[in-house]
UniProtKB/Swiss-Prot annotation:
Keyword annotations of the record: Cytoplasm, Protein biosynthesis
GO molecular function: ribosomal large subunit binding
Listed GO CC annotations: cytosol
Cellular location(s): Cytoplasm
Subcellular location, principal: cytoplasm
SUPFAM superfamilies: Ribosome recycling factor, RRF (SSF55194)
Function: Responsible for the release of ribosomes from messenger RNA at the termination of protein biosynthesis. May increase the efficiency of translation by recycling ribosomes from one round of translation to another.
Protein name: Ribosome-recycling factor
Length: 186
């Protein structure tokens, strides 16, 4: 009578929400130079929109300085424009095929704005984790209704799903706390 319920798919989907959150948080400016800061920048190149890292090498030159080595000399202008138009508040200095980007210190107001954005990303990740939990609970209810599992199994699996959900929500909170600390650090 007992069909087995596999929680590994739910864990994989919840892990995907955490990975997305970490990727989004990595793109938030903290006042320190990191190559991931320019990940959201796309350049209009060769008739299409390409990620910056597909037309240039991004490296950290100093604690507050990024260096962007453009591979094609004709792409320097479009790369410069893409970085300026990216809403990151960055202004590159062009030196031949290299763009130097000084990362200005964040003022208090900008730090608070970044923290709010980080909170928004974290809340979206929590919602995604809860959606996965709901899908798992719905699957359990369907299995119970179809008499594929008993009530005891349904309750046991529901408790297991809740435990995993709590674990992943905790991971979201940890990632948010670490990013907030990094953002607020002067």
């Amino acid at each position: 009578m007992s069909a087995e319920f596999d929680i590994s798919d739910l864990k994989r989907r919840m892990q995907g929400a955490i990975a997305t959150l970490k990727h989004e948080l990595g793109g938030l400016r903290t006042g320190r130079a990191t190559a991931s800061l320019l990940e959201p920048v796309h350049v209009d190149a060769y008739g299409q929109s390409l990620p910056l890292n597909q037309v240039a090498t991004i490296s950290v030159a100093e604690a507050r300085m990024l260096s962007v080595q453009v591979w094609d000399k004709g792409m320097v202008g479009p790369v410069d424009k893409a970085i300026r138009d990216s809403n990151l508040g960055l202004s590159p200095t062009v030196e031949g095929q290299i763009l130097r980007i000084r990362i200005p210190e964040l003022n208090e107001q900008r730090r608070k704005e970044m923290a709010k954005v980080a909170h928004k990303y974290a809340e979206e990740a929590k919602v995604a984790v809860r959606h996965v939990r709901r899908d798992g609970i719905d699957t359990l209810k369907k299995l119970l209704k179809d008499k594929a599992i008993g009530e005891d199994d349904e309750k046991r699996h529901a408790a297991e799903i809740q435990k995993v959900t709590d674990q992943f929500v905790g991971e979201v909170d940890q990632a948010l706390a670490a990013k907030e600390k990094e953002i607020m650090q002067v």
